[in-house]
């Protein structure tokens, strides 16, 4: 009796949730950096389209090596898989027309929610006015 078992292996994408959790973890550990100018060679008037071979920013493994240094000198330099940023995000809690944020003052929030619509998060730690609304309706109930 000859039975044949065939196994096929293929790559598959991780679940959306696991990708989101991974990115959120990296986001929470992101490092603020400044760009070092040392080690960059070539004509700075060429703009972004200059020949990469002249810029001196290739690493030994053929990848691009960014010249990032920690914004705070007490912090360690970011690794090749770390998320980095140059500027802090604007404070979305306060109105800032230049950044295009309206702030959260005067917005409705849900006092019982722990999500983004919850008062604790939306009001940015400030106090908030509570109100209760009662609506009386005819229900056409039968007993």
UniProtKB/Swiss-Prot annotation:
Glycan attachment residues as annotated in the record = 110-111
What are the transmembrane regions? none
Q: How is it modified after translation?
A: Palmitoleoylation is required for efficient binding to frizzled receptors. Palmitoleoylation is necessary for proper trafficking to cell surface. Depalmitoleoylated by NOTUM, leading to inhibit Wnt signaling pathway.
Localization: Secreted, Extracellular space, Extracellular matrix; Secreted
Keywords in alphabetical order, please: Developmental protein, Disulfide bond, Extracellular matrix, Glycoprotein, Lipoprotein, Secreted, Wnt signaling pathway
Residue ranges annotated as compositionally biased, kind Basic and acidic residues, are: 46-60
> Which cysteines bridge via disulfide bonds?
109-124
- What are the GO cellular component annotations? extracellular space
Q: Which GO terms describe its biological process?
A: canonical Wnt signaling pathway; cell fate commitment; neuron differentiation
Q: What is its main location?
A: secreted
Q: Per its record, what are the GO molecular function terms? A: cytokine activity; frizzled binding
Polar residues compositional bias, start-end: 64-75
A Pfam family matched in the record: wnt
Q: State the residue spans of region: Disordered.
A: 38-81
Q: Tell me if Lipoprotein is a UniProt keyword of this record.
A: yes
Q: Where is the lipid attached (O-palmitoleoyl serine)?
A: 1
| Function, as annotated | Ligand for members of the frizzled family of seven transmembrane receptors. Probable developmental protein.
Of which family is this protein a member?
Belongs to the Wnt family.
Task: Spell out the protein name for this chain.
Answer: Protein Wnt-1
Name the source organism.
Evasterias troschelii (Mottled sea star)
């Amino acid at each position: 009796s000859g039975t044949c078992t065939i196994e096929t292996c293929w790559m598959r994408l991780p679940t959306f949730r696991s990708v989101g959790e991974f990115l959120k973890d990296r986001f929470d550990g992101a490092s603020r950096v400044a760009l070092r100018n040392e080690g960059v060679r070539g004509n700075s008037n060429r703009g972004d389209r200059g020949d990469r071979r002249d810029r001196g920013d290739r690493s030994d493994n053929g990848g691009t090596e960014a010249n990032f240094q920690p914004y705070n000198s007490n912090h360690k330099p970011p690794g090749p898989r770390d998320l980095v940023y140059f500027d802090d995000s604007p404070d979305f809690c306060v109105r800032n027309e230049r950044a295009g944020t309206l702030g959260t003052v005067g917005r409705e929030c849900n006092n019982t929610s722990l999500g983004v619509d919850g008062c604790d998060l939306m009001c940015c730690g400030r106090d908030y006015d509570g109100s209760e609304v009662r609506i009386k309706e005819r229900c056409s109930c039968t007993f």
